[in-house]
A protein has these predicted regions:
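Conserved catalytic core of the tyrosine transesterase superfamily
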Residues: 1-226
C-alpha cells in the first residue's frame, strides 16, 4: 500500500483493466440498411390482395394494418373486436413484452375492418378479429400465412423482394422508410413503430444523409474542448 506525504493511506490503482473496471459501450447490432419496397409496390400489393386474394376483404384489412400502422403479424393476429374504439378512432395494440399502445385508426384502415366485420367475417364465438375461413372459425395458429399471401402477390406482380427471407416485415420497414424520406423526425418514426430504444430507429437514418445530419448529436467530450 502507498502513503501520502501526510501519512494518509491511498488505494493502489489496479494493475490491469478488467470488465468490471471498464464501462460498457452500447453497440448497435444491426448495421445493415433496412430492406424495403417503394410506395408504388406497396400500393400495388395492397390492391392485389384486395382483388385477387381468396379472402380479399379479410386479407386486405390485415395488410393495411401492417402497411399503414407498421404492425407486426403477431400484433395483427392478436387484435380483438373490443380493441377497436370506433368513437375515438383508436386501436389497442398488444405488442412485445406485454406492451399496450393505443394508436389512431386511419380512415382507410377503419373502413377495411368495418367491411370485413360487415361482409366477410363468419359468425363465431371468438372475439379475435381476424379468423380462419373454415370451421371452427378461430384465430390463426400460424403467422406464416401472411408471408405466403405476400409471396403470391409479389409473384403475380413480378415484384422482387429486397431479401429472400424478409417476409411481411418488409411492410413495416417500407412504412418507416417512407416516413424518413418524407422528412419525418426519427423520434416520431420510432413512436409510430413503438421502438423501445432509439438505437433501433437509428438504422433508418442511414437512408438519408440530410436527415442524418438533423438528428446527429455532438459528442460531449468534443463540446468540452471548444
Amino acid at each position: 500500500r502507498g502513503h501520502t506525504a501526510s501519512g494518509d493511506e491511498i488505494t493502489p490503482a489496479p494493475r490491469t483493466l478488467t470488465s468490471s473496471t471498464v464501462p460498457k459501450v452500447h453497440r448497435i447490432q444491426n448495421n445493415r440498411l433496412p430492406r424495403y419496397l417503394p410506395p408504388t409496390d406497396i400500393e400495388a400489393i395492397l390492391e392485389w390482395v384486395r382483388r385477387e386474394s381468396s379472402y380479399g376483404v379479410r386479407d386486405y384489412a390485415m395488410f393495411l394494418l401492417m402497411a399503414r400502422l407498421g404492425l407486426r403479424v403477431p400484433e395483427v393476429m392478436a387484435i380483438e373486436i373490443d380493441d377497436i374504439d370506433w368513437r375515438a378512432g383508436e386501436l389497442l395494440v398488444r405488442g412485445k413484452g406485454k406492451r399496450r399502445d393505443r394508436l389512431p385508426l386511419p380512415e382507410d384502415v377503419g373502413a377495411a375492418i368495418s367491411a370485413y366485420l360487415r361482409d366477410a367475417r363468419p359468425s363465431t364465438v371468438t372475439r379475435v378479429l381476424f379468423v380462419r375461413s373454415y370451421a371452427p372459425y378461430l384465430g390463426f395458429k400460424d403467422s406464416r400465412i401472411v408471408s405466403k399471401i405476400l409471396a403470391r402477390a409479389c409473384a403475380a406482380l413480378k415484384i422482387e423482394m429486397p431479401a429472400r427471407y424478409l417476409g411481411s416485415h418488409v411492410l413495416r420497414h417500407s412504412l418507416a422508410t417512407r416516413m424518413v424520406r418524407s422528412g419525418v423526425a426519427l423520434h416520431e418514426v420510432g413512436d409510430v413503430l413503438r421502438h423501445k430504444s432509439r438505437a433501433t430507429t437509428m438504422i433508418y437514418a442511414k437512408l438519408d444523409i440530410a436527415n442524418l445530419r438533423s438528428v446527429a448529436q455532438p459528442w460531449p467530450a468534443g463540446e468540452a474542448k471548444q
